[in-house]
Amino acid sequence: MCRARFGVLNDLYLELLNEGIDDVKFMGINGFNYSNHSFNCMICDDLENCSNCDNINTIPWTQDLDDGQNCLDQNQELCEPNDENGDVWDIWNVILRDLIILDREGKLVAKINLTYNNPDPTSTCGENYDTIKNLILNAR
């Protein structure tokens, strides 16, 4: 299920690029609590060993840490090191499958949980997909 949502976001990113929209960026941040889980088949970087993948995803993927490096200066009150939560997830107050949309200045435009708002264009008559796409386009 998670791979499907990440795959849909990858497809949306490629769709935007094909439409000539190249001033938006996507990335995934794996939660600290999931750092010991295999995510290869979720991000589809190993097609030979992942039966759920048609193509390699192009969206960059990174790992959240709990080392406090992001809890300095203006973020001091937002997170703390070694609390068993990732620093970035603490700062943004996210949960599993949250999609964060930022504007050009890095300000929050929207936070949507993809567990409850399936982005698949074949679900909800494409309404969630279109809403997410429009939020991204309007944040540019």
Predicted feature locations:
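Solvent-exposed loop/turn segments at secondary-structure junctions
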Residues: 1, 31-36, 65-69, 107-108, ...
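Conserved redox-active cysteine motifs that mediate thiol-disulfide chemistry
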Residues: 1-11
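Helix-adjacent hinge/juxtasegments
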Residues: 2-3, 15-60
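Short amphipathic alpha-helical segments and helix-helix/interface helices
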Residues: 9-17, 89, 133
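Structural recognition of the beta-strand scaffold that forms the well-ordered cores
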Residues: 24-30, 59-63, 98-103, 108-111
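Short, internal strand/loop/helix patches
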Residues: 27, 43-96
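Short aromatic-enriched loop/helix-cap "lid" or pocket-rim segments at secondary-structure transitions
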Residues: 38-41, 74, 113-114
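Thiol-/selenol-based redox modules, centered on thioredoxin-like
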Residues: 86, 94-140
